Amino acid sequence: MADWLYQYPPLLAGTLIKRYKRFLADIELDTGEVVTAHCPNTGPMTGMCAPHSRVQISQSNNPKRKLAYTWEMIEVCDTEPTWVGVNTQIPNLVVKQLLQNRLLPTLGEYDQVKSEVRYGREKSRIDFLLTGTAQPAYIEVKSTTWAIEKQALFPDTVTIRGQKHIRELISVLPAAQAYLLFFINRADCTTFAPGDQADPEYGKLLREAVATGVGLLPCRFEITPEGIRYLGLATVEESSLTR
């Protein structure tokens, strides 16, 4: 379809047996074959590893890979059956398309979309830098999969690296614009809030960043075995930013 920002290769359906050692998942395919897939997600994947859940995996023909299969998504049923993206390499590919197609009017006018540019006092790499007629805009992307009811939450664990990224974004103000783009990797969430239960310090820094002028872009996406489409911005409840 024309509105896909990303299309998956043909995927294989199956059922999750277990995730272990962070990067491995045993999966029973619908054919009955049991395979071990690479789990391209270093986080705890809170609420996303229930045995017997439906999953989709991709298969690589690269003979140099140790594992031919990659775990791409899992179906959760928190409020309704919903596919949630597992592969953390996908969000930046999708966001690049989002930016190149000018689908976020909040960002104003820009001519170039640059990726992985070094910046900041702590020598980080920004996911995207927009340059053009207006101020440059620094955009940090965070994949968001944890949800309580219909509220997306980030982070789902303590993230020292994420805290560093917030400090870096604050440091570019006011000479440039700065944004945190939360890639909500599931279609069932309509609101967003900091994951204070998992990382209170991150929540504190996020509120400081917003008060300083860093913009929040909680972007909702629909994940399906066919592809990914943009659903618009989630609502950020003011009460979640005023603690």
From Swiss-Prot:
Domain of life: Bacteria
Coiled-coil zones: none
Pfam families cross-referenced by the UniProt entry: SfsA (PF03749), SfsA_N (PF17746)
Gene3D superfamilies per record: 2.40.50.580, 3.40.1350.60
Signal peptide as annotated in the record: none
GO molecular function: DNA binding
InterPro entries: SfsA, SfsA_C, SfsA_N
Annotated family: Belongs to the SfsA family.
Protein name as catalogued: Sugar fermentation stimulation protein homolog
Naturally occurring in which organism (per UniProt): Acaryochloris marina (strain MBIC 11017)
